[in-house]
């Protein structure tokens, strides 16, 4: 049986997984990992068994760095860091590395709050200095991103923090916000749930970070991309393993990195290149999300509450107008091989996370089911 036949056989037993994270991975990647599980490239070792200092893993790591830089067109004056702890840890790591950049005596940062994750980010940052809420959409239930013209930014803030795709509520910045980066303002963004889904304007962001478990690979790996001149401002009490400068100087191996998660991420990077790169995936993601939103908008049975100008391409929350039918919807969806559609407990309803690895056929199957469920429920 050749690789294509094995992939076809495996696909026939798989479901369409709409989990928000950990999330669906490309089947090709899983098949390759399966083939290489016991002996990577004839080494006689699984990647999980390799020394992170050995030649084999050094090759894996170097390829992952190189491919990610190429895919996102990361400029040479930015450092790519492979870390651990997820975006939750970065909520502390960011202020520990940046908040004292302008003033050690009066550390300060601006935060734009557009959903659950940016709420958590600003709460954590308050442990390390003053936080100014430059804008928030909380009074609108986070259904819309505040217009940039309304943001109240501080002249003495070390950085502006955003979450450019809020996984739970389903809002996404569709444009890079212009907040004066050309005049020295530093913009930091949590991109956990939409990294590699669209190109990045590096004039607009000086630090990006995200957990890998949504759009890159398995849980355990965190990626930060930091402009090099922003390294070296860490708080004296910042743990060494979370000091961006030390991590950069040690090639992301100051401590033992999450080797297998990096290996899988590297396979995903190669898969993205075979798909035509980030630009090709963006086109595909627009098609997938438009298909789902168009169906919801045309229906009197389902609804999406997010303002059309900032709907997420990755995370599509929706509700049944008759919410008493929600459990039946989920149960029948599972019977059709459509899983992990339940919305976050803080929001309710449903949520379809349609990351890069979700094929168009998965979204088509979901829409077909939603149409049929609406018909029989009418």
From Swiss-Prot:
UniProt keyword list: Amino-acid biosynthesis, Aminotransferase, Cytoplasm, Pyridoxal phosphate, Pyridoxine biosynthesis, Serine biosynthesis, Transferase
GO biological-process terms attached to the record: L-serine biosynthetic process; pyridoxine biosynthetic process
InterPro entries tied to this protein: Aminotrans_V_dom, Pser_aminoTfrase, PyrdxlP-dep_Trfase, PyrdxlP-dep_Trfase_major, PyrdxlP-dep_Trfase_small
EC assignment: 2.6.1.52
Pathway in which this enzyme or protein is active: Amino-acid biosynthesis; L-serine biosynthesis; L-serine from 3-phospho-D-glycerate: step 2/3; Cofactor biosynthesis; pyridoxine 5'-phosphate biosynthesis; pyridoxine 5'-phosphate from D-erythrose 4-phosphate: step 3/5
Cofactor(s) this protein cannot do without: pyridoxal 5'-phosphate
GO cellular component: cytoplasm
Residue positions where N6-(pyridoxal phosphate)lysine is found in the record: 214
Entry binding sites for pyridoxal 5'-phosphate: 117, 167, 190, 213, 255-256
GO molecular function: O-phospho-L-serine:2-oxoglutarate aminotransferase activity; pyridoxal phosphate binding
Binding site for L-glutamate: 53
Keyword set includes Iron-sulfur: no
Cofactor note: Binds 1 pyridoxal phosphate per subunit.
Function: Catalyzes the reversible conversion of 3-phosphohydroxypyruvate to phosphoserine and of 3-hydroxy-2-oxo-4-phosphonooxybutanoate to phosphohydroxythreonine.
Similarity field: Belongs to the class-V pyridoxal-phosphate-dependent aminotransferase family. SerC subfamily.
PANTHER family: PHOSPHOSERINE AMINOTRANSFERASE
Assembly and interaction partners: Homodimer.
Protein name according to UniProt: Phosphoserine aminotransferase
Organism: Ralstonia pickettii (strain 12J)
Classification lineage: Bacteria, Pseudomonadati, Pseudomonadota, Betaproteobacteria, Burkholderiales
Primary gene name: serC
